[in-house]
């Protein structure tokens, strides 16, 4: 009887241990998945930002080529410029969507983190988790601040190059090109400063990814 009783205790202990392990692994896996999703959204937004800047460079080049005085191939250059303007506008809209998705994922990730954190009974673990979450939240908050300034500058630039495109579609003559040259030069100047405006956004995004990688933040959210 004693042997059976001991055997029953061993089996029960093993079953409880297995259940705890499965629950812990599931929680841990979910945390890592959310961390991976969050990092991926930031990477997508950063890649989109860099691609948009490259497209702005292409638009700058085609506009600069278009306003050269006394040129013969005006029609083809205008078509190239128009195509670049449309690409830039399309990429700017996609960038805005990517940044919105990134911020939504970040909010969900931190909310899930905080929810799990409240279940911790170990005060030192709860405190450590709270500090890591606060560090990530601080990094996240810098992205929308920097993004707003860049987005405003990009939208202003797009407005300029689109108005130039519209005017030249009405008057693609040497005189017409000459008349929009001051506006084009302003657009070129503003476009040239976009990279400087984008730099804080890129820095903020890279800080987020650095914080995500530091000390296994995904594991912390998952309850490790």
Region locations from a protein language model:
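Extended amphipathic alpha-helical interaction segments
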Residues: 98, 102-182, 199, 214-215
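Long amphipathic all-alpha helical oligomerization modules
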Residues: 30-40, 155-224
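Core hydrophobic alpha-helical transmembrane segments of single-pass membrane proteins
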Residues: 15-16
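C-terminal motif of bacterial Sec signal peptides marking the signal peptidase cleavage site
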Residues: 19-24
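Long amphipathic alpha-helices with heptad-repeat character
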Residues: 42-56, 85-88, 92-106, 143, ...
């Amino acid at each position: 009887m004693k042997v059976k009783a001991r055997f029953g205790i061993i089996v029960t202990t093993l079953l409880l241990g297995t259940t705890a392990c499965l629950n812990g692994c599931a929680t841990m896996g979910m945390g890592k998945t959310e961390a991976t999703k969050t990092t991926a959204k930031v990477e997508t937004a950063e890649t989109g930002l860099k691609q948009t800047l490259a497209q702005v460079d292409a638009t700058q080049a085609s506009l600069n080529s278009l306003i050269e005085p006394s040129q013969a191939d005006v029609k083809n250059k205008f078509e190239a410029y128009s195509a670049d303007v449309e690409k830039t506008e399309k990429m700017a809209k996609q960038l805005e969507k990517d940044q919105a998705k990134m911020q939504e994922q970040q909010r969900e990730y931190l909310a899930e983190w905080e929810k799990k954190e409240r279940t911790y009974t170990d005060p030192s673990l709860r405190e450590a988790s709270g500090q890591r979450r606060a560090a990530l939240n601080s990094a996240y908050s810098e992205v929308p601040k920097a993004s707003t300034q860049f987005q405003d500058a990009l939208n202003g630039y797009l407005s300029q190059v689109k108005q130039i495109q519209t005017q030249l579609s009405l008057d693609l003559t040497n005189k017409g090109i000459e008349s929009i040259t001051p506006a084009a030069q302003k657009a070129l100047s503003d476009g040239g400063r976009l990279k400087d405006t984008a730099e804080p956004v890129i820095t903020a995004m890279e800080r987020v990814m650095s914080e995500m990688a530091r000390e296994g933040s995904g594991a912390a959210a998952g309850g490790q």
